[in-house]
């Protein structure tokens, strides 16, 4: 699995909703209507992550959940991260 170039990541960001690249990581924060809705979102993403064996870092702050994607094994953003970002967009709106 190869790390994507800056140009490849920039191109992919055009098709993603609310994702930003910061410090070599893709990040998206989503504010949910309730704390429990955020927890349910984490569960849904966790199920998908298990299916594809690619796990985001997840931060929960009351109703705001932040998903961070990077392929730690290669030290950068890969196609797996882009695919997971698309999966998260499909779950919670693109």
Curated annotation (Swiss-Prot):
The modification N-acetylalanine is found at residue 2. GO terms for biological process: tetrahydrobiopterin biosynthetic process. Its EC number is 4.2.1.96. The keyword Lyase applies. It catalyses: (4aS,6R)-4a-hydroxy-L-erythro-5,6,7,8-tetrahydrobiopterin = (6R)-L-erythro-6,7-dihydrobiopterin + H2O. Pfam families: Pterin_4a (PF01329). Keywords: Acetylation, Lyase. GO terms for molecular function: 4-alpha-hydroxytetrahydrobiopterin dehydratase activity. SUPFAM superfamilies: PCD-like. Belongs to the pterin-4-alpha-carbinolamine dehydratase family. NCBIfam families: PRK00823.1-2. This is Putative pterin-4-alpha-carbinolamine dehydratase. It comes from Mycobacterium tuberculosis (strain ATCC 25618 / H37Rv).
